[in-house]
Every structure is written in C-alpha cells, then in structure tokens.
Amino acid sequence: MAQVINTNSLSLLTQNNLNKSQSALGTAIERLSSGLRINSAKDDAAGQAIANRFTANIKGLTQASRNANDGISIAQTTEGALNEINNNLQRVRELAVQSANSTNSQSDLDSIQAEITQRLNEIDRVSGQTQFNGVKVLAQDNTLTIQVGANDGETIDIDLKQINSQTLGLDTLNVQQKYKVSDTAATVTGYTDSATAIDKSTFAASATTLGGTPAITGDLKFDDTTGKYYADVSGTTAKDGVYEVTVAADGKVTLTGTPTGPITAGFPSTATKDVKQTQQENADLTEAKAALTAAGVAAAGHRSVVKMSYTDNNGKTIDGGLAVKVGDDYYSATQNKDGSISINTTKYTADNGTSKTALNKLGGADGKTEVVSIGGKTYAASKAEGHNFKAQPDLAEAAATTTENPLQKIDAALAQVDTLRSDLGAVQNRFNSAITNLGNTVNNLTSARSRIEDSDYATEVSNMSRAQILQQAGTSVLAQANQVPQNVLSLLR
C-alpha cells in the first residue's frame, strides 16, 4: 500500500462506517421512542399498506359496536313503552271481566267504561310520544337499519310496529254496548211532482206550437247515470214524447228533446213555459207507514221529500242527500234509479227474537247529527253499531248484557304486544351477540396489526446498543485513521 498524505482512504472508510452506525442508532432510537416498527412507508411499504387496512377495519368495527349498543337502546326504549301498554291492557281486561257481570248497574258500567276510555287514551299517548333520538318508535310501522359491520350490507333490522288502540282493535271497545243492529230499508213506491201540468196549449219559443193540451203525464223519472229528470209529454198535436225536465228557481220549466224522443227539424230544441211553483212533495209513504209506526213515529201530517245539506267544521256546505219530512222531523232517505225514494232504516232484533225497524232520523244541532229513533226515543247512529236493543219502553233502563267477545279482542291485543316484545327481546340478544363478535374481531385485528407495525423493544434495544458501541468504536478508529499521514512525515526527517 502506497504511503500518501493527500488522500486518507482509511479515514474515509472509517467515516462511512461511522455514518452507517449513526443511521442505525437513529432508527433504533426512533422506533423505541414511537413504539412503532413502521414509522413511514420506507420502513416497510407492504407492511404499512396492510397495517393501514387493518386500522380502517378496526375503526369501522369499533363504531359498529357502538351502533349495536344504540340498537339495544332503541329496543329497550320501545320495550319499556310496550311494557306500560301491556300494563294498561291488563287493567282494561280486568275491567272488561268486571263489566261482564250482570249485577252491574248502568252507572257501574258507565264508570267502568270511563276508566277503559282513559286507559286506551293513555295507550295512544304512549304510542304517539315515545321516541329515541327523535324517532317515534310506536307511532307508525317502521324498519330501522343498524350498521353492525365495517362493510356495506352488514346490518341488522329492527322492525317497529304502530301500537295504539286502533291497531290493537280496541278503539271501539265499549262495555256499554248492549245492542245489535243491521241495516235495511223501507222503500217508498215513488213520489210525484204535484204541479207539473202545463196550463197553456202553446210554447212561444221559435213560434212553434205543440197544439192540443200538452201535459206532463206520470211521475218524473230520475236517471242516476246522467243525474237528470225526464217526463212524458202527451196531449199535443205536434210532438208527444220524452223530454228532459228542468225547473228553474223562478218557476219556469224547460223541456229538452232527448234521444228517446228527439225533436225534429223545424221544432225548437228547447221550449220554456211558466208553470206553478213546484216542490218535491206528496211522497208516497204508504208502504213505509208500517215501518214508521213500528219505530214509534206518527206518520200522519204533512210529508214531503226535501234535499238536506250541512256545514262541516271548516264552514263548508256539504250535500246531505235527501230526507223525508214527516211533520217537523226529517228522516234519511235515498233516491233510487227508478225514481223511487227509500227511507233509510235500521232493522234490529229484540231479545225475544222479534224483528223491529227503526228510522235513521236527522237531528241534533242544526240537523248535523244522524240518530236512530226507536220507541219515541233517539240514539246516536254511530253508537248503535254492535248493540242488541231490548224490547222495553225505556232503553236507558234496559238490563246490561255482555259485550260481544270483549275479552277475546283484548287477548288478541295482548298477543300483538307480546309478539312485538318478543321480537325486540330477540333482536337485543342478537345485538349482544354481534357486539361480542365485533369485540373479538377487533382484538384479533389489533393483534395482527401490532405484529406488523409495532416495535420489538428487545430487538430495538439490542440494535441501539450495537449502534452506540459502533459509534464509539468508529469515533476512536477515525481518530487513529486521521493520524496515518503523520507517519509519512517521518520519512522526511
């Protein structure tokens, strides 16, 4: 080896090794201080990518576990409300059993019904107001989807049902129901317009004359399809036939040609003539009289067919259909396609098996309330359904009878609540299982990620100690290497 002083190769070699040991010492100190084997992608590019995916899964599963706990909370909130509904139903059933006892007076039944109504109202309140984080859990049918995994589609559904007195089938539960009715009708043979005779022999329109003594014969006929009235016009020398009849407010009647009785060329399509003021009067109540009498309604006196209307809560006038007026009373009626009038009645069976008939009477404030008239007394029609009228003079004092299968209805409601509670209990157990599984998965993934990216302190401490020793040795050797050129100077002495 040549002896030179310009280039100190040994010093350069020593410096290079010293830099390596210093880099190794820095890496060891970084890993020991951070606790991570992979502090950047340069430490392990593949390991860094794998560990990053593990981190995403771990965070997703951890949040999914929290979601599952929220699902348990929702189910518990809902079940708590259902438990209170169940308590109310149990009390309603107890009251229904009490009401079935024939020793109860009417006032007893009224008191029992009052508490039943309050209990059902409380069920409706619980249903409408129970909520979890703004979600009303019993107010409507709903499915809540809970994310219990780190990936799409990893969900558990909570099926919620609307639970209130109506969905439970108890909104009409009434221990005061003592009657049973069914709808039928007493039919009037027809009614006639009593003032339709035309008292002049000519129609002035278009200077056309019918000739003879024209008159509207027979009853006015109502066509349900077109909503129009028709009449036969006879006694003319020009054109007998069927005409559409329209009566104006001023008392004028207009006859219009129809396909069944066309008006030919040279004859006007319409002809107008003054007639007497018309009314829908003289309803033929011959066949209905028996029903009126049976219902305790005197059929004598003035009778007419009138058109009814009423005003709803918004002030809007609503068509109330037809009614037959008997004296000062009005009874609901229906106009048939053939022009006849049917009085709407209610047929009921007395406890002795006798068939009875009641009329649907229009009464109450401003004629807005439809009632059933029986034996000279009136009862709200909406309260009549499901009743069994007693053939006694005063229905208010009629002996109480058992409501039709009230306990069966309540038991069905209890079963409906129990079914939903069972579903909620099952889904809670499912959430608990999911949470346990999520915890196990998170633990395993965390361990796997740790093996990839965490520092092995035993290894890193050894690496640091080795690097420190190499640093010390390198520094000492570098000092010696720097002295080598000095040896060359001895040759110059």
UniProtKB/Swiss-Prot annotation:
Keywords per UniProt: Bacterial flagellum, Secreted
Coiled coil residues, start to end: none
Keyword Secreted carried by entry: yes
Chief place of localization: secreted
Transmembrane segments: none
Keyword Secreted: yes
CC per GO annotation: bacterial-type flagellum; extracellular region
Any one GO molecular-function label of the UniProt entry: structural molecule activity
Note: Individual Salmonella serotypes usually alternate between the production of 2 antigenic forms of flagella, termed phase 1 and phase 2, each specified by separate structural genes.
Family listed: Belongs to the bacterial flagellin family.
Biological role: Flagellin is the subunit protein which polymerizes to form the filaments of bacterial flagella.
Record-given protein name: Flagellin
Organism: Salmonella rubislaw
